[in-house]
Regions:
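Phosphoinositide system proteins, centered on phosphoinositide phosphatases
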Residues: 1-174, 203-326
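A phosphate-binding catalytic loop at a beta-strand-loop-alpha-helix junction
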Residues: 179-198
C-alpha cells in the first residue's frame, strides 16, 4: 500500500510518501488438498514430517527477515476442523524451532524475529457481532504494529547557491518499516483479505495520528473499497469468483444481499473446484511436459528470442571481452 500527497490540493505539493507492506501466503509446510463435494470438508494431506519441513521453513522465513525485518505470523485457521488444526500444529512447530527465535543471548520475546498469533476467524466471528468481531485482532497485534511502524519519506528543497537557479528537490526518508505481518488462512483469500484490511487501517491510523490528523468517513470508505477490489481480483485468479465477505469489507456491514452473494460464490467455487480445475491442471501439465511418458516440451517465446538476438547484435555497446590466463 502506497500513498502520496495530491499535487492538486495545494500550490506546492508536500511530497509526502507513505508506504506499508504486508504479506499473505499459505502455511509454509508441505501439504496438499483434494477436491470434495462438501464445502470446507476437502481432505488435507501433509506430505512431509515436521523435521523434514524445517529446513525449507527456515529458508523461507530467513528470506523474509532479510527483506522485511521481523515477521509476525497471523494464522486464521480453524482450531476445530481436523485438517486446519493439523496445519496449525505444524506451523506452530516450525515457528518454535525456527532459528529466528533463538537469537544468541536474546531470549526475551521482545527480541524474537518471528512471532505467531493464532486467531480462529470463524470461531471469533460466529457470535452476534458477526464479522465486526474480527476487529478483536487489533489488541493481539498492536504491539508489533507499533514496533513495525511504516515507511515515510518527504521531498525537501535544496536551496540553490545562485538565487536565479531553481532549487532542486530531494527525497529524505523520515521513517522505515521495521517488520511485516504475514497473514494466512487456508487459501489466503477471504479471511486473509479482511484481516489485512484491518492491519492496513491500523497503519493508516498510526500515520495520521502522528501528523495530528483524522481521516473523514469518505476516506475510509475508499480504503475499504480498494481492499475489497483487491480481494475480488485475487480470488478470481485463484478460485474463479470474487472474494467472500467482500460486502462486509466494502461497506463495513453484512447485508442480506451480501450473504446471498457469498452463497452464490461458494456454489460456483464448488463447481469449478470439482469439474473445471482438473481439466485446467491437466492442460498446464501438458504444456509444461509433466505428464507421464510425455515428450519434453520446449516453450517458444518469440519476444524473448527477439530481444536476446538484438542484445547480442549490440553487445559491443555495453560489454567488452578480454583474454586472461589462469
Amino acid at each position: 500500500m502506497v500513498g502520496q500527497s495530491d499535487p492538486s490540493t495545494s500550490e506546492k505539493p508536500s511530497g509526502i510518501c507513505f508506504s506499508y507492506a504486508q504479506i499473505r501466503g499459505s502455511v509454509p509446510v508441505f501439504w496438499e488438498q483434494a477436491a470434495g463435494l462438501i464445502p470446507g470438508q476437502q481432505k488435507i494431506t501433509v506430505t512431509r514430517s515436521p523435521e523434514g519441513t524445517q529446513p525449507a521453513f527456515d529458508k523461507h522465513f530467513g528470506e523474509l527477515e532479510q527483506n522485511y525485518g521481523s515477521v509476525h505470523v497471523v494464522n486464521l485457521l480453524s482450531e476445530t476442523k481436523p485438517g486446519e488444526a493439523e496445519l496449525t500444529n505444524l506451523y506452530r512447530y516450525g515457528v518454535r524451532h525456527s532459528a529466528l527465535n533463538h537469537t544468541e543471548g536474546q531470549n526475551s520475546q521482545d527480541h524474537q524475529l518471528l512471532r505467531e498469533t493464532e486467531f480462529d476467524f470463524h470461531a471469533e466471528t460466529k457470535g452476534p457481532n458477526g464479522y465486526e468481531a474480527a476487529s478483536m485482532i487489533r489488541r493481539l497485534i498492536e504491539n508489533s504494529a507499533d514496533g513495525f511502524a511504516y515507511y515515510l519519506s518527504e521531498e525537501i528543497d535544496d536551496s540553490a547557491e545562485d538565487p536565479q537557479e531553481k532549487s532542486a528537490r530531494r527525497t529524505v526518508v523520515v521513517l522505515q518499516q521495521e517488520g511485516v505481518f504475514r497473514t494466512n488462512c487456508l487459501d489466503c483469500l477471504d479471511r486473509t483479505n479482511l484481516i489485512q484490511t484491518i492491519i492496513s487501517q491500523m497503519a493508516m491510523e498510526s500515520f495520521l495520528a502522528h501528523r495530528g490528523e483524522r481521516a473523514a468517513s469518505d476516506f475510509w470508505m475508499r480504503h475499504s473499497s480498494l481492499w475489497a477490489d483487491n480481494g475480488d481480483a485475487l480470488s478470481r485468479i485463484y478460485a474463479g469468483t470474487g472474494a467472500l465477505k467482500s460486502s462486509f469489507t466494502r461497506h463495513g456491514k453484512m447485508s442480506i444481499a451480501g450473504a446471498i452473494a457469498d452463497a452464490r460464490k461458494s456454489a460456483t467455487r464448488l463447481y469449478i473446484n470439482n469439474f473445471a480445475d482438473k481439466g485446467r491442471q491437466n492442460t498446464i501439465d501438458v504444456l509444461l511436459g509433466r505428464m507421464m511418458g510425455q515428450t519434453p516440451v520446449h516453450l517458444f517465446d518469440p519476444m524473448n528470442d527477439y530481444v536476446t538476438a538484438e542484445l547480442a547484435k549490440r553487445s559491443s555497446e555495453f560489454s567488452s571481452s578480454e583474454s586472461i590466463n589462469m
